[in-house]
Amino acid sequence: MGQKIHPLGFRLGITQEHRSKWYAKASDYPRLVLEDKKLRDNLFKQYPKANIVDIIIKRRQTTQDLETKESVDVIEVSIYTAVPGKIIGRSKATITELKESLEKLCQLDRMKHNLPQIRIILTILKVQNPYSSASVIADYLIEQLEQRIPFRAALKKALERIRLAKLEGIKIEISGRLNGAEIARSEWVRKGRVPLQTLRADIDYSAKTAKTIYGILGIKVWAFKGERT
């Protein structure tokens, strides 16, 4: 019986890097992992149309706030997005508000455990070739399917956009009650090569869900960018 492994975790240290870059004591590790997840989930939920490709989180050593003289944990959050304007807005005040909202998100849990408060440093970076990202392709399909566009038409539109990204291969799978069918099924399409068993293959992967009037549809995208030597 075939066993499946996550395409990104399978290639960590070869073609993929960790999304969270920090070290911690064994006792603090679970809490910090959950804190990272909370920050990421909040950003993806708050900016669904920003086409966020990736969020990298780095943590510095605990330092002292110059004004309050209290200990603070500094967290660097780098957001890679295709549409920076959706996050930045028209003024710098938007970024300040975002930083404050993210700090408040973690503040209550830290107070319960008597831990230092956090200071977030935000960096927003524009991605030049967004449709080479599996996450952006999945977001585009979600938008189409939630607007009741037939799944085959949505796949065709997505493949047209992917051609401009010059990927070496793409595989897309959609599962659920497709076009409102009584029985759920899976449909997939593949263009080019997608060598999932080759470790040196630079493959981006994303799995997301679309909420339609017929129920939830699962979307999986594998994007093959080439082999690393």
UniProtKB/Swiss-Prot annotation:
Gene Ontology annotations of biological process type: translation
Alphabetic keyword roster: Chloroplast, Plastid, Ribonucleoprotein, Ribosomal protein, RNA-binding, rRNA-binding
InterPro entries referenced in this protein's UniProt entry, alphabetically: KH_dom-like_a/b, KH_dom_type_2, KH_sf_prok-type, Ribosomal_S3_C_sf, Ribosomal_uS3_bac-typ, Ribosomal_uS3_C, Ribosomal_uS3_CS
GO molecular function annotation: rRNA binding; structural constituent of ribosome
SS bond list: none
Cellular localisation: Plastid, Chloroplast
PROSITE patterns in the cross-refs: KH_TYPE_2, RIBOSOMAL_S3
Superkingdom of origin: Eukaryota
GO CC term, one of those recorded: chloroplast
Signal peptide feature range: none
Family matches, as SUPFAM superfamilies: Prokaryotic type KH domain (KH-domain type II), Ribosomal protein S3 C-terminal domain
Domain KH type-2 intervals: 39-128
PANTHER family: 30S/40S RIBOSOMAL PROTEIN S3, SMALL RIBOSOMAL SUBUNIT PROTEIN US3C
Matching NCBIfam families: rpsC_bact
Recorded family membership: Belongs to the universal ribosomal protein uS3 family.
Subunit structure, as described in the record: Part of the 30S ribosomal subunit.
Protein name: Small ribosomal subunit protein uS3c
Native organism: Tupiella akineta
